[in-house]
Amino acid sequence: MSLGRLLRRASSKASDLLTLTPGGSGSGSPSVLDGEIIYSKNNVCVHPPEGLQGLGEHHPGYLCLYMEKDEMLGATLILAWVPNSRIQRQDEEALRYITPESSPVRKAPRPRGRRTRSSGASHQPSPTELRPTLTPKDEDILVVAQSVPDRMLASPAPEDEEKLAQGLGVDGAQPASQPACSPSGILSTVSPQDVTEEGREPRPEAGEEDGSLELSAEGVSRDSSFDSDSDTFSSPFCLSPISAALAESRGSVFLESDSSPPSSSDAGLRFPDSNGLLQTPRWDEPQRVCALEQICGVFRVDLGHMRSLRLFFSDEACTSGQLVVASRESQYKVFHFHHGGLDKLSDVFQQWKYCTEMQLKDQQVAPDKTCMQFSIRRPKLPSSETHPEESMYKRLGVSAWLNHLNELGQVEEEYKLRKAIFFGGIDVSIRGEVWPFLLRYYSHESTSEEREALRLQKRKEYSEIQQKRLSMTPEEHRAFWRNVQFTVDKDVVRTDRNNQFFRGEDNPNVESMRRILLNYAVYNPAVGYSQGMSDLVAPILAEVLDESDTFWCFVGLMQNTIFVSSPRDEDMEKQLLYLRELLRLTHVRFYQHLVSLGEDGLQMLFCHRWLLLCFKREFPEAEALRIWEACWAHYQTDYFHLFICVAIVAIYGDDVIEQQLATDQMLLHFGNLAMHMNGELVLRKARSLLYQFRLLPRIPCSLHDLCKLCGSGMWDSGSMPAVECTGHHPGSESCPYGGTVEMPSPKSLREGKKGPKTPQDGFGFRR
């Protein structure tokens, strides 16, 4: 069969699968029964917040989607997730969430007793059992139902038995409260009555069929089986291992009522808000365990009544990533697909979205009664949107770093070094040695001996600053405690606590960070301390590993880098002015949406945290530090962090435009993206934006200083594009940058009557 026919057939099957009128349309075509599982995947992780990660970062579980009747929509999708730990101990209250009451598996007749093996006779497989078996793999499993009369035994292949058991968290020796594997490899439940007096569970004999799962097979053509390479469906026409266990488990007792409220984990996990990360209280051990059981416990929601579903792919193959489910009360649940399967889930959601839209048109159901938003983000950029030198530089390693040092220890070819760091970053093993150069604590012309002498001198100065702080008068100390120390003491104990370097009670590294921040407030009282500075100091201390050196690196960061946490309003306003102009130049549609929102939209509240905390809370630490290094390299601009902001908007801001989000919704949209954006993708896009900006033959005078301070590098002169005046210079008759105002032609004047001239008319920018 050709690939086109295969995909069309797969699409047809998906339409049958997701028909919003369970029970069929009477045309004889196959349909999905109420409660039918249509997607399942094991080892889908839930990650607890920082305060609970000491009890384990990864909490894998079993996730499935199944159909359920809905009075308003006809049918809806139910998402259920059960932690592997509860499956392992056969927690029936938890298992009922992934095999609902209406499921045909639940309604299937169960054997009342064990079938004893005939003495001296071994079980011989019947011709029916010799048919090709369907293997539930540890990869993603999509279950497609068919109405068929024949019976067929479905079991894993022998080589997959151990893999299946491990994927479900089943050990070789099973205690009585855990599931066991039958010879066919299907998980089965052992009731307390089946346990022997010695406390050991009896192993099923070869002739026992108690742990087997029977599926109907008649009418299923060979063409209905989709290859895993089709990127559409995998493992069709089979029930999941958990459903198999529940189908034949005679010891299981299910509650017949399905009206219990959703798991308390709905309210247990909130996404980071616009002002900071989730502020997790400090629990004692019993409270931590209880909170963990709530957050990482059974989770079940009706996807048809959620606010949004978002899929974030994190790998180039677009199989792994995160699923973020948001309720209408703006509560979030994040599921991590570390081992693939997210692409298949995306196929299911897209088909469901299409069917739902068709159903809404037919029944005229209000859109606000269903899932309002659905989006997919894939980490790919077209080749036309990448810097031409993107793949030419590798990460700066030890050997490459040593090649830049001469015999005296001086850094040679500084421009090439900064360019290499801009494109490739720095290896973790040498960050502590290279960062002081980027932060201008060390001069590139300094020798090794001069740097050692500088360290001794700066250590003495640091000691004097600390002594000045400790020798304050009582009145000075009270004022200092009220204005600085109180906030510092509150912040340092919750900064980067998931980092091993700062983890644990009475950690001396936390005290070092505290002293650095307090001493900096004494060293620079005009700046003092503002919330967020601890987020900047912590990574530097963890890499430099010396309190005095870290202090002076932080001083260099605050003095010589625009990419800092600044408490002054005028600095933030300057950053926002540049960012608005960049968006006007590079992303016209988004800028026009901001203008349509008025002054609130142009304030761009969604990006304030990006600028104040240097993206520390928007990306995982490894990616955030890569962004820091690219900004510290000062390659071709001192404002590369603004290009990072534009890149985020360009990649993740389409939903804002398409859905015409208001200011508060836009703030929520970008806040929800925290820790789910692809840092490498954003970096590549930002480098491309900078490259295209440098190619512009003319720029608005409002962006004249964007690339002025970084120097010309190896060239005799810097970039000198023509400057076009924007005309916004109150109190000045002429443009201070020598910009010229282009006189419009009569033709453009006639066109101007039809509407205002957009930035896109004045500046050509290759997207």
UniProtKB/Swiss-Prot annotation:
InterPro entries per record: Rab-GAP-TBC_dom, Rab-GAP_TBC_sf
Spans annotated as Disordered: 93-138, 169-228, 729-767
Name under which the protein is recorded: TBC1 domain family member 16
Gene it is expressed from: TBC1D16
Pfam families with a match to the protein in the record: RabGAP-TBC (PF00566)
Key word tRNA processing present: no
Cellular component GO terms held in the UniProt record: cytosol; early endosome
Boundaries of every Rab-GAP TBC domain copy: 425-635
